[in-house]
């Protein structure tokens, strides 16, 4: 669920992963709101492998301190290390993954309302920023006038 904010990812509990409904529960997201997000089958498989390897108990991503989750800083350090190993030089942060996820949803035709819900935005205006980032091919847009058999005029 790469649409999560870094603090939301850090504070995920094992019980927040609902593999039957393919959902992730985000508790106390920005503004203190709870919400649900989608869980990809590919991510679920990776989470299962991760669980079998590390056997976390309460927090999905356990921290160095006992009974605590991973820190935001640790996630950021892992991201930058992975970016370096991959040879990616373009500026990017953990938050870039969230922006990319939203942009891909919009490019795939997901409604702005659904993207807003997934990202946990209070206002649809906040979500519209992804419309400007999206590089939709205008040549692929079909005019509503071409969708009818009735003559015009």
Where in this protein do the model-derived segments appear?
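Conserved tyrosine-mediated DNA breakage-rejoining catalytic core shared by Y-recombinases
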Residues: 4-49, 125
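C-terminal catalytic core of tyrosine-transesterase DNA break-rejoin enzymes
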Residues: 1, 98-122, 129
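A short, basic/aromatic helix-end/turn motif that makes direct DNA contacts
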Residues: 12-16, 116-122, 131-132, 146
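Catalytic tyrosine of NAD(P)H-dependent dehydrogenase/reductases that use a Tyr as the general acid/base
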Residues: 91-95
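C-terminal catalytic core of Y-nucleophile DNA break-rejoin enzymes
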Residues: 29-48, 59-80
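ATP/adenylate-binding site constellation spanning eukaryotic-like Ser/Thr protein kinases
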Residues: 14, 40, 44, 75, ...
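C-terminal secondary-structure termini that scaffold catalytic or DNA-interacting sites
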Residues: 146-153
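Catalytic-site neighborhood detector that most strongly recognizes the C-terminal catalytic loop/helix
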Residues: 28, 125-144
